[in-house]
C-alpha cells in the first residue's frame, strides 16, 4: 500500500538535520544512515548517502530521478549466489 497524500513523506529527523546542516555549509560529505525507510526528498539531491544493508554501508549518490523512492530500495540486502548445482555424479 502506498502512503496517503495527506501525510508528508517519512524522513528520519537525524537524517534531515544532517542534510540541512550540509546544505547551509555547502559541503558534500558522505552521510552514514541506518534509516532505510526514509523517503528521498529534493533537498537530498547531490549528496552521497551511505545506506546500511545489514552488513556494511553502501554509498549511493542521490539524483533527481530517485526523489520519492525509499533509501532502502538502492541498497540490496541479499545477494543471490545461484541455485545449487545439479550434480548427477553424486546421486550414483
UniProtKB/Swiss-Prot annotation:
Highest taxon listed in the record's lineage: Eukaryota
Cellular component, GO, one term: mitochondrial small ribosomal subunit
Any one GO molecular function term: structural constituent of ribosome
GO biological process: ribosomal small subunit assembly; translation
Location of this chain's protein in the cell: Plastid, Chloroplast
Subcellular location, principal: plastid
InterPro entries in the record: Ribosomal_uS19, Ribosomal_uS19_bac-type, Ribosomal_uS19_CS, Ribosomal_uS19_SF
Keyword RNA-binding applies: yes
A Pfam family recorded for this sequence: Ribosomal_S19
Keyword vocabulary terms for this entry: Chloroplast, Plastid, Ribonucleoprotein, Ribosomal protein, RNA-binding, rRNA-binding
Free-text function comment from the UniProt entry: Protein S19 forms a complex with S13 that binds strongly to the 16S ribosomal RNA.
HAMAP family assigned to the protein according to its UniProt record, in alphabetical order: Ribosomal_uS19
Family: Belongs to the universal ribosomal protein uS19 family.
UniProt xrefs under PANTHER family: RIBOSOMAL PROTEIN S19P FAMILY MEMBER, SMALL RIBOSOMAL SUBUNIT PROTEIN US19M
Protein name, as recorded: Small ribosomal subunit protein uS19c
The organism of origin for this protein: Phaseolus vulgaris (Kidney bean)
Amino acid at each position: 500500500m502506498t502512503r496517503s497524500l495527506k501525510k508528508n513523506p517519512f524522513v528520519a529527523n537525524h537524517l534531515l538535520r544532517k542534510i540541512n546542516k550540509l546544505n547551509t555549509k555547502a559541503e558534500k560529505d558522505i552521510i552514514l544512515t541506518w534509516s532505510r525507510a526514509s523517503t528521498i526528498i529534493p533537498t537530498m539531491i547531490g549528496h552521497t548517502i551511505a545506506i546500511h544493508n545489514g552488513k556494511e554501508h553502501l554509498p549511493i549518490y542521490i539524483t533527481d530521478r530517485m526523489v520519492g523512492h525509499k533509501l532502502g530500495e538502492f541498497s540490496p540486502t541479499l545477494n543471490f549466489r545461484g541455485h545449487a548445482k545439479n550434480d548427477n555424479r553424486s546421486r550414483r
